[in-house]
Structure formats: structure tokens, C-alpha cells
């Protein structure tokens, strides 16, 4: 057993660490906490050097995206007639083949874009998301300018995905950011706005700051 006085004495060296919190567990009483409080009276918490990592996840895997991250971009119909046909026909086998090939090639995240002529994107996005999560544990990056399609995909996604993308246009921020907040998604932010790509670096930084502070 330890007395309240000894407990407080043993805790005193930790004052120098400028802890954010100190307390007692089972076995301590109000007297323990009273003396502990006197030890830490006036102690100013320090600033933590620990940075929370930026991660995406599925139920069984996660990816830290703070550094270089390999994103597979083949689940995208742009310039791919065969892929567009597969989407119109809801040929999930073809879509899943593209996913598996990218996983085998070392992709860490899979971009998912199902926007093509003749495709009901809001209806197809959740079907593709669910099909992909049945064959791969990699996180998905939902890629669409259709807000309804994004929400439908986010609703069925298991884990924390990333949305591709938003920019500094207020209309885009107002449409996309609430979805990301609602479903806990990360987001790709592009340092452009209604003026396009600005030549001055400080202007792009200002747009990036506008996105992160929105």
C-alpha cells in the first residue's frame, strides 16, 4: 500500500514534464487527489510535439497519407471506352479486375470514378464501392463532381475514405465539406478557385488556407 503523502511525493518529478493531466486510479481516495493537486498547482501544460497522423482506413487496414502515397487511378472512365462500356453495363467483374491489378502493382489507395455518359452515377457509385470492398482492403478515394454520387458512396463505405476533391470555390466548399464532416472523410484540396490556377505562390497558399480553415 502507498499513503497519499508518498503518492504525491512520487508524482512530484512528473511536474517537470508539464503534463496536461495527472490523476489516480483505483485505490486512490479524495485525499490522494487533494495532495496531487497541491503538487501540480500552478503547473503550465507544455505544448505536445506529437502530431496526429493523417490516415485512411478500412475495417482491416489503414494507410498513413502524410508522406508519398501511391493512388491507383485506373478505376476511371476518362479516355477509356472499354471501361465506360463496363460501367454502362454494370460489369463489376471488369471493374474489380482493374482494382486487383492495381493492388498487385503496389497501390495503397484506389481512386473510384464512375462518371461517364449514359451512367446513373448516384446509383452506380455505391454499388461499385460495395463491390470493391468485397475484394480489397485498401482504402478508397471517391472521385466525383456529383454531390449525390459522393454522398451515396460515402454512406456505404466501411471505414474512413478520402474525397477527390474540392477547391477554393465557395460553392464547392459549401457542397463538399459538410459531406466530409458528416461521414468522417479526408479530402483532397486543390489550390485553385474560380480564377483558375494563379501564378503567384502566395495566392495559392491563401486558397489552401481558405480550404483548411473552412
Question: Model-found features: residue ranges?
Answer:
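Domain-level signal for soluble alpha/beta catalytic cores
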Residues: 1-214
Amino acid at each position: 500500500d502507498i499513503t497519499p503523502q508518498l503518492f504525491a511525493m512520487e508524482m512530484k518529478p512528473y511536474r517537470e514534464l508539464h503534463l496536461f493531466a495527472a490523476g489516480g486510479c483505483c485505490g486512490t481516495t479524495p485525499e490522494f487527489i487533494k495532495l496531487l493537486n497541491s503538487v501540480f498547482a500552478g503547473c503550465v501544460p507544455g505544448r505536445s510535439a506529437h502530431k496526429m497522423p493523417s490516415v485512411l482506413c478500412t475495417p482491416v487496414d489503414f494507410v498513413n497519407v502524410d508522406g508519398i502515397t501511391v493512388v491507383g487511378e485506373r478505376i476511371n472512365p476518362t479516355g477509356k471506352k472499354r471501361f465506360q462500356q463496363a460501367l454502362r453495363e454494370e460489369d463489376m467483374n471488369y471493374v474489380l479486375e482493374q482494382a486487383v491489378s492495381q493492388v498487385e502493382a503496389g497501390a495503397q489507395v484506389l481512386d473510384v470514378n464512375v462518371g461517364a455518359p449514359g451512367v446513373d452515377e448516384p446509383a452506380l457509385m455505391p454499388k461499385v464501392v460495395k463491390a470493391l470492398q468485397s475484394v480489397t482492403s485498401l482504402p478508397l478515394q471517391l472521385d466525383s463532381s456529383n454531390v449525390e454520387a459522393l454522398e451515396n458512396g460515402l454512406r456505404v463505405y466501411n471505414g474512413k475514405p478520402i474525397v477527390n476533391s474540392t477547391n477554393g470555390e465557395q460553392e464547392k466548399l459549401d457542397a463538399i465539406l459538410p459531406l466530409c464532416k458528416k461521414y468522417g472523410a479526408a479530402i483532397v484540396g486543390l489550390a485553385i478557385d474560380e480564377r483558375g490556377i494563379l501564378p503567384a505562390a502566395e495566392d495559392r497558399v491563401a486558397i489552401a488556407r481558405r480550404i483548411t480553415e473552412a
